């Protein structure tokens, strides 16, 4: 799991973003383009729920491009 510098602008560190993105509790495709954009919710090592946008390439490579503390409107998506 790679983390783009743009994903860090909301104060989430790269390790936390990668951990949350690698083990999502919610995942949804945002479009059918290539690379596919996926919206994910996951927890970092501090147990913060993060919202993430991850590019998923056909090769299997994944790149986090957005990471921030999850906004309340996404809590209903949790299982």
Regions found by a protein language model. Name each.
Residues 1-79:
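Ribonuclease/tRNase effector modules and their secretory precursors
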């Amino acid at each position: 799991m790679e983390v783009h510098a743009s994903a860090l602008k909301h104060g989430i560190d790269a390790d936390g973003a990668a951990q949350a993105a690698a083990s999502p509790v919610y995942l949804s495709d945002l479009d059918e383009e290539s690379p596919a954009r996926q919206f994910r919710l996951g927890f970092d090592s501090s147990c913060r729920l993060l919202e993430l946008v991850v590019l998923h390439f056909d090769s299997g490579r994944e790149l986090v491009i957005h990471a921030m503390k999850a906004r309340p409107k996404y809590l209903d998506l949790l299982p």
